């Protein structure tokens, strides 16, 4: 089994990328430089191939301890098969990083330069400075927004050995053979579960953007304490509200500050907010229309993307804004590109303006979030989409989608049964955009999962 190592200076996002690959939090992530001191290792699966992923200690020369970590890390690199060199796209590349990257180039191992924290167009422009590394393979990513990760995975996938067991192939063949034309077999819970449960809606945002005022307006009573003092809400506040015979459970989460200011009880509250979002269906991402949008707003919105939630962007304090709505909407679309599927509504929580529209939006998005798309319609769509825009070849070989079926709800998860499971991220984006034009998917993410047909050889 091949070994893939993540390497770079402290605080460039190695541990966050490690956690993103693994799918759960194993490595501790922090803004404190050098949080990872020992290497973390685990077996992961990229599409249908397995590898050992290694999160190295940060390379820094600021202390004796880090000198020991550096020596250990360099030893790990020599024993690995694939190297991901991570840099921070928010800062100009350093000479030390360039020297280190060039030294790894001499190892004759697959080496990629991964530029993290590319969260905006300004960051993309700055990333051109990294051309100086002379990297053959270079990727711009945003771990916090889950942007560009699939492209890195596809690059790694091509370098891994085929190690699919006979049992794995047989199990997937059994799974496909049990799907009827309507795609009846789905993961864990069927649609009746979602019809009968309350819709859980998390209210998230920076401190003092009006989350508690919004909760009070939505449930029509003073359930949460409202104050001009930032960070009044520490404990989550739950309140049920029935609309059109459907129970909606609103949760007002603790306001989130910049990481450097989080300590003690607020750190506990932040952790609890993330655990709450794991259980939510929809997030109301609250922005303050009277202030410029910040990087912290982006990071908080990234939580909604991280937990694959339905999203409504709520532009609060609209009565205090003098800007044109269309212009503000464009700013939001540019800044929160990773939530392009989320509808935007302007409200005044304290004044109660346009609050009533949020209930209908929640019900609409929840229906989209939990819907089942007929397999026959999915396959008709795939046939038309691939005919209009053929799938790019992989290493000169044709890539085909044999069959598509929905295998999960909340959000919709679509299995694409293929001869080769390397689906470029840009083509995946194309399919998702086309799906949004053909199906009712407003406000919900869509997850496409390439799967290899058991016991089939790659077709030419």
Swiss-Prot record:
A single MF term (Gene Ontology)? GTP binding
Binding of GTP 2, residues:
205-212, 252-256, 316-319
Q: GO terms for biological process?
A: ribosome biogenesis
* Domain (KH-like) ranges: 371-454
Report domain EngA-type G positions: 2-164, 199-370
SUPFAM superfamilies, alphabetized: P-loop containing nucleoside triphosphate hydrolases
Query: What is the stated purpose of this protein?
Result: GTPase that plays an essential role in the late steps of ribosome biogenesis.
Q: Which family does it belong to?
A: Belongs to the TRAFAC class TrmE-Era-EngA-EngB-Septin-like GTPase superfamily. EngA (Der) GTPase family.
The protein here is known as GTPase Der
Task: Read off the lineage from the record.
Answer: Bacteria, Pseudomonadati, Campylobacterota, Epsilonproteobacteria, Campylobacterales
